[in-house]
Amino acid sequence: MANPIVGRVWKFGDDINTDAIIPGKYLRTRDMQIFGTHAMEGIDPEFTKKAKPGDIIVAGTNFGCGSSREQAPLALKHSGIACIVAKSFARIFFRNAINIGLPLMEADVECQEGDEIKVDLFKGEVLVPEKGIFKGNKLPDFLLDILNDGGLVAHRKKVKGEHK
């Protein structure tokens, strides 16, 4: 996992539902690229045409609420989103994102869509040029380890290999 994560901002509001992140009609596929090409389609059908790899989502409260589908963070990850910063996350979305290796941070950040920001997960800070540093909730070390290893499955394989 790269740290800090530097990327262009896409802004979203409160209560962004998993059904809006990846509509249910795409849930039967196992092709991750299909998930990626339909990310955020329920809110902005053109999102994946505009977003670029390395971009960052900044959102309000309760990001990822709704049904507990792992496909929602997978869709964002496979669309190229490098990180999500939100005032708060639905708990199941938060853990699903960690489990698949999608970095995120809870922070109240003042920025505009299109701004380039720097997210430092190890410090729990977001730097917005000309606006300053916004303190967020630093992830515990064990969650940073999971993200660093690329997600829970990769982390377990690494840990298991270290204990042989």
Curated annotation (Swiss-Prot):
The keyword Lyase applies. GO terms for molecular function: homoaconitate hydratase activity. It is an enzyme of class 4 (lyase). A motif (YLRT) lies at residues 26-29. It catalyses: (2R)-homocitrate = (2R,3S)-homoisocitrate; (2R)-homocitrate = cis-homoaconitate + H2O; (2R,3S)-homoisocitrate = cis-homoaconitate + H2O; cis-(homo)2aconitate + H2O = (2R,3S)-iso(homo)2citrate. Pfam families: Aconitase_C. Component of a hydro-lyase with broad substrate specificity for cis-unsaturated tricarboxylic acids. Catalyzes both the reversible dehydration of (R)-homocitrate ((R)-2-hydroxybutane-1,2,4-tricarboxylate) to produce cis-homoaconitate ((Z)-but-1-ene-1,2,4-tricarboxylate), and its hydration to homoisocitrate ((1R,2S)-1-hydroxybutane-1,2,4-tricarboxylate). Is also able to hydrate the analogous longer chain substrates cis-homo(2)-aconitate, cis-homo(3)-aconitate. These reactions are part of the biosynthesis pathway of coenzyme B. This is Methanogen homoaconitase small subunit 2. It comes from Methanosarcina acetivorans (strain ATCC 35395 / DSM 2834 / JCM 12185 / C2A).
